[in-house]
Design a protein with these regions (language model features):
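Ankyrin-repeat boundary/"N-cap" motif
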Residues: 1-15, 36-49, 72-90, 111-120, ...
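Substrate-binding/catalytic groove segments of enzymes
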Residues: 96, 109-111
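Ankyrin repeat domain, specifically the short helix-to-loop turn at the C-terminus of the second helix
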Residues: 1, 25-34, 60-69, 100-108, ...
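Ankyrin-repeat-protein effector appendages
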Residues: 104-105, 119-188
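Residues marking helix boundaries in flexible regions
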Residues: 4, 10, 14, 24-25, ...
């Protein structure tokens, strides 16, 4: 059984127009990390929904209580992690407060999927916050570390994209970018 769909508290968190912060605080105090992913295509956690809905108060409670500021979605289909909370935050121009909070709490502004939050950012405030925090586009990362260009043309078979092959290439290229960033940080 899916713990996510069967847990009433997660149903409440996702469906309440304005989740009660006292309930979230109670859960945090009891060790909740909110690392339960939905079983749908997106694989989001409650925190991803809060980021998209601009609910920075609940995100702050959860992260300061021990939840991962770089929590990723989990694709059940590809069995891999993907976008962090920051991707959700920058997907809407009006969620700049969430973007600012995540950056202040240490979110990785250059996490690549292979796109980065700066590649996907909507709204001038989100873009400025990211740039001020040292964010780069995936193309800037590629050039800075002299990495090969993203080319998924080999993922086509008989004129159609093989989604499994594309997914694997996508993941490998993301890892290449993320490893380059990690290595650069370690040598600082």
């Amino acid at each position: 059984p899916c713990i996510y769909q069967n847990a009433l508290i997660y149903d409440y968190i996702l469906n309440a127009d304005n989740p009660n912060s006292q309930i979230i605080k109670y859960l945090v105090n009891r060790g909740a990390k909110f690392e339960v992913h939905d079983e749908g295509y997106s694989g989001r956690t409650p925190m991803h929904f809060w980021a998209r809905r601009n609910n920075y108060q609940l995100l702050e409670l959860a992260i300061k209580g021990g939840a991962n500021v770089d929590m990723q979605t989990f694709s059940k289909l590809r069995k891999c992690n993907n976008e962090t909370l920051l991707f959700e935050a920058v997907s809407e121009p009006e969620t700049y407060r969430v973007t600012q909070l995540l950056i202040e709490l240490g979110a990785n502004v250059n996490f690549a999927t292979p796109t980065t939050p700066l590649d996907d950012a909507k709204g001038s405030r989100n873009k400025k916050l990211l740039k001020d925090a040292g964010a780069m586009t995936s193309e800037q990362i590629r050039k800075k570390f002299n990495l090969p260009a993203y080319d998924s043309s080999h993922c086509e078979i008989d004129g159609k994209t093989d989604m499994d092959l594309l997914g694997k290439y996508h993941d490998e290229y993301s890892k290449l970018l993320n490893d380059a960033i990690k290595k650069a940080k370690e040598s600082e």
